[in-house]
């Protein structure tokens, strides 16, 4: 059986995407099957209907996210979105000079980086980085053990610096931008208390403690003459790193295993900001994964949520981020096996195993354009121990596309909510000024169908005229540079 494609295959360039002011035609991403029409399988037809995100529905989602943004800016806990004050009131200008460092802690590895900055003309003169694994023992040990280990590795990293490439100005202490990707209540640019551990960490004696103080004390104990100048998360680091190269960057979005977004906000639009000055701008960390209103939840989303580590929380994240897309597909396929003959008269045992299908598998199956979908068949055989006929392979890809289409379009609605909030206060796009969204994360980078669905939603909601002034830029791994730059921007010298 051969597959028919309705349009020529074109894949958008990943580095940057600017929307045309005219409607596009004949522009789709390669996909074995797209969920544009209802399936002949009743279970799949209902699932597609439950996941549908037509433009009017997406508009309601974007409006609800915008309402939550305003509520969160008005008062702490005002809405699903926390709208956290980051205290980043100054972004990199390009004038920064000197040697600065970045530490990124957010999973089973941490990364350290050194950056020698040469000002407007020379920008980044030199940079080095190193990634170090964190053992399971340290992840559930004490704060002294974890931060002591990090400080010792930082000291080793500094000791290996090549004198000809990196130069610390005499009389200055080394300064560090600390990317700490765990829930924190930030109290200033260089202090914040841990709310709770996530991602498998359960370090004792830390909750409610100032994470910056813990790291500073550990560095001092190891004889390292270094201090934390800026505490940020990966979204803020991405925005700052991208802004260094492009002054039109206004939004930073992470779409990977997890998801988050931050943006440049006018201080006068933040009622909960109790400061003497309401002029200028600051960066808001939306924590948009916590959004939960009017989302197209299915029985499979509800089941997955009930068995998650945080039931009832972060429902938006569970629909749009890479950690969950494969698991939703697995649950749908299991139900189809149990109620139909998708893979014959039995459900493969591996299909009952949580996380047996990962988002990277969905991507590979959707990119299969062979006549017999042989790559789909190989993935199903290798990871689920099932030999699927052509009809089953097509059904599987339809399920993948349905889940990914919903995720990409919902992510697009979230970005539109932020862009429209910025537009309301600044009238940037309406006056023809370019607005850039800096994107990072493996889901955005490696899943072309997801990217396309997200971009489609942006154009549908903004309209072609406003969308033509929006640029989506893939800015891989700039959060480390951004953290170092924020250390420079907030230097005590």
Curated annotation (Swiss-Prot):
Q: Which residues bind ADP?
A: 107-109, 257, 442
Q: Which InterPro entries match?
A: ATPase_NBD, Hexokinase, Hexokinase_BS, Hexokinase_C, Hexokinase_N
Which segments constitute the Hexokinase domain? 38-488
- List the keywords (alphabetical): ATP-binding, Glycolysis, Kinase, Nucleotide-binding, Transferase
Q: Which GO terms describe its molecular function?
A: ATP binding; D-glucose binding; fructokinase activity; glucokinase activity
List the catalysed reactions. Answer: a D-hexose + ATP = a D-hexose 6-phosphate + ADP + H(+); D-fructose + ATP = D-fructose 6-phosphate + ADP + H(+); D-glucose + ATP = D-glucose 6-phosphate + ADP + H(+)
Residue ranges, annotated region (Hexokinase small subdomain)? 93-232
Extract the SUPFAM superfamilies matched here. Answer: Actin-like ATPase domain (SSF53067)
EC number(s) per entry: 2.7.1.1
Q: Binding positions for D-glucose?
A: 198-199, 233-234, 260, 287, 317
The similarity annotation says: Belongs to the hexokinase family.
* A single BP term in Gene Ontology: hexose metabolic process
**Entry's Gene Ontology cellular component terms:** chloroplast
Pathways involved: Carbohydrate metabolism; hexose metabolism; Carbohydrate degradation; glycolysis; D-glyceraldehyde 3-phosphate and glycerone phosphate from D-glucose: step 1/4
Task of the protein: Fructose and glucose phosphorylating enzyme.
Q: What PROSITE patterns does the record point to?
A: HEXOKINASE_1, HEXOKINASE_2
**What is the protein's name according to its record?**
Hexokinase-like 1 protein
Q: Where is this region: Hexokinase large subdomain?
A: 233-477
Cysteine pairings via disulfide bonds: none
């Amino acid at each position: 059986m051969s597959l028919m494609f309705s349009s020529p295959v074109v894949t958008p360039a990943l580095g940057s995407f600017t929307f045309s002011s005219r409607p596009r035609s004949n522009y789709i991403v390669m996909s074995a099957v797209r969920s544009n029409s209802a399936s002949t399988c009743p279970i799949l037809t209902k699932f597609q209907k439950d996941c549908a995100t037509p433009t009017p529905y997406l508009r309601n989602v974007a409006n609800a996210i915008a309402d939550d943004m305003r509520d969160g800016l008005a008062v702490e806990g005002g809405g699903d979105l926390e709208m956290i004050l980051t205290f980043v009131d100054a972004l990199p200008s390009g004038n920064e000079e000197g040697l600065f460092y970045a530490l990124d802690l957010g999973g089973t590895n941490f990364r350290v980086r050194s950056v020698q900055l040469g000002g407007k003309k020379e920008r980044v003169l030199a940079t080095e980085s190193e990634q170090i694994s964190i053992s399971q023992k340290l992840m559930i040990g004490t704060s002294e053990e974890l931060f002591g280990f990090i400080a010792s590795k930082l000291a080793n990293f500094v000791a290996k610096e090549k004198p000809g490439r990196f130069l610390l100005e005499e009389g200055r202490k080394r300064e560090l931008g600390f990317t700490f990707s765990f829930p924190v209540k930030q109290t200033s640019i260089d202090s914040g208390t841990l709310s709770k551990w996530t991602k498998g960490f359960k370090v004792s004696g830390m909750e409610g403690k100032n994470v910056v103080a813990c790291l500073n004390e550990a560095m001092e104990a190891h004889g390292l003459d270094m201090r934390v100048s800026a505490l940020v998360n990966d979204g803020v680091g991405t925005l700052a790193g991208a802004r260094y190269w492009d002054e039109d960057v206004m939004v930073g979005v992470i779409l990977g295993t997890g998801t988050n977004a931050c943006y440049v906000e006018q201080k006068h639009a933040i009622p909960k900001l109790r400061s003497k000055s309401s002029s200028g701008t600051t960066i808001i960390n939306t924590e948009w994964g916590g959004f939960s209103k009017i989302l197209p939840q299915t029985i499979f989303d509800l089941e997955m949520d009930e068995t998650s580590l945080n039931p009832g929380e972060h429902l938006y994240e569970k629909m749009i981020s890479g950690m969950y897309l494969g698991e939703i597909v697995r649950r749908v396929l299991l139900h189809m096996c149990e109620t139909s003959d998708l893979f014959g008269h039995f459900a493969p045992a591996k299909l009952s195993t949580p996380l047996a299908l990962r988002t990277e598998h969905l991507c590979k199956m959707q990119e299969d354009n062979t006549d017999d979908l042989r790559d789909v068949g190989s993935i199903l055989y290798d990871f689920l121990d099932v030999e699927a006929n052509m009809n089953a392979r097509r059904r599987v890809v339809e399920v993948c596309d349905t889940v990914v289409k919903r995720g990409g379009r919902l992510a697009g609605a979230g970005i539109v909510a932020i862009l429209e909030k910025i537009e309301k206060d600044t009238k940037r796009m309406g006056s023809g000024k370019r607005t850039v969204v800096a994107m990072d994360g493996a889901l955005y980078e490696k899943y072309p169908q997801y990217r396309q669905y997200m971009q489609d939603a942006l154009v549908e909601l903004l309209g072609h005229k406003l969308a033509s002034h929006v640029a989506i830029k893939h800015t891989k791994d700039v959060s480390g540079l951004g953290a170092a730059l924020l250390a420079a921007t907030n230097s005590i010298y």
